[in-house]
């Protein structure tokens, strides 16, 4: 796998004061020197960064990017605006979900444009990234299919905490840490080694309050989900955010094909589960079936 880090200037798309950059890593299969046929555009969740898809603190068996490049697919992983190494606009209150989605869409556009030809794009978002991939697909329809992992349009289950408690802990504006201790039971199954959990938590990112507030707002992307007109895959683990996974596909009423996959023996962070390869295989098969 060949990996290239980049800082993508999305100033014009974001429309904020000062320059605005999205940090990204492009993972390509070994030996790929030309335009890829298939690209996965991957957005991490709240409190995370793009290393979720290729964690430097774990062996390669935990690398989503490594596994998918071995299948011949390119992976573009970004840090969401305001998170990881991407710009942290000030005041944070100048951000909105629409601005963040526009910045992400521009980052994807720039990378695809460099190849000078058509590329089949799968947009994929995990958790809060699922919310953002829905928003992006609705407002900037440049993806051929959308995979929503661990995001619930139903009222969310949040481990040992709840929506009301997290809402009460939000500050008016700024960048905040995700309370990880109450999330452990939601994020990790019993088979995930403690050392891996602690390393994952040590690499956490802060999150813009704007995104945290949106993610805790019931129905925040219901209208956007209903407007997506490409194939959609909904993925929930047996321990995850939706109280009724079977109801999740119904929110994507304009999609020509909606599929639900349940990841067995896994919690919310599927990439750390012992069943992760089965999950990746099912996801890869769906991409190929809908290409």
Question: What does each of the following model-derived ranges do?
Answer:
Residues 51, 79-95, 268-269:
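Glycine-rich "HGGG/HGxG" loop immediately N-terminal to the catalytic nucleophile
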Residues 33-76:
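Short, surface-exposed "cap/lid" segments of acyl-processing enzymes
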Residues 236-267:
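Conserved loop-alpha-helix segment in the C-terminal half of the alpha/beta-hydrolase fold
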Residues 94-115:
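Alpha/beta-hydrolase active-site loop
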Residues 266-277:
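Catalytic histidine-centered segment of alpha/beta-hydrolase-like enzymes
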Residues 115-127:
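Alpha/beta-hydrolase fold nucleophile elbow
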Residues 157-244:
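Alpha/beta-hydrolase
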Residues 1-33:
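N-terminal cap/lid segment of alpha/beta-hydrolase-fold proteins
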């Amino acid at each position: 796998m060949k990996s290239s880090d980049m800082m993508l200037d999305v100033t014009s798309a974001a429309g904020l004061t000062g320059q605005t950059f999205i940090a990204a890593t492009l993972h390509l299969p070994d030996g790929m020197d030309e335009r890829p046929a298939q690209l996965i555009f991957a957005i991490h969740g709240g409190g995370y960064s793009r290393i979720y898809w290729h964690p430097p603190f774990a062996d390669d068996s935990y690398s989503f990017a490594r596994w998918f490049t071995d299948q011949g697919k390119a992976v573009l992983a970004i840090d969401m605006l305001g998170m990881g190494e991407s710009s942290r606009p000030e005041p944070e209150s100048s951000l909105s979900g629409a601005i963040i989605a526009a910045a992400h869409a521009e980052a994807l556009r720039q990378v695809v444009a460099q190849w000078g030809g058509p590329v089949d794009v799968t947009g994929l978002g995990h958790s809060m990234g699922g919310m953002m991939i829905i928003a992006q697909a609705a407002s900037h329809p440049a993806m051929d299919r959308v995979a929503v992992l661990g995001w619930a349009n139903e009222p969310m289950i949040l481990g040992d905490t709840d929506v009301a408690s997290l809402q009460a802990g939000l500050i008016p504006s700024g960048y905040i840490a995700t309370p990880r201790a109450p999330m452990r039971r939601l994020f990790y199954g019993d088979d995930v080694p403690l050392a891996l959990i602690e390393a994952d938590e040590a690499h956490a990112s802060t999150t813009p309050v704007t995104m945290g507030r949106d993610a805790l707002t019931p129905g925040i992307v219901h209208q956007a989900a209903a407007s997506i007109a490409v194939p959609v895959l909904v993925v929930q683990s047996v321990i995850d955010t939706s109280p009724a996974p079977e109801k999740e596909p119904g929110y994507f009423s304009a999609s020509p094909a909606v599929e639900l996959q349940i990841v067995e023996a896994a919690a919310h962070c599927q990439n750390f589960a012992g069943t992760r390869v089965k999950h990746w295989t099912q996801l890869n098969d769906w991409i190929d079936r809908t290409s």
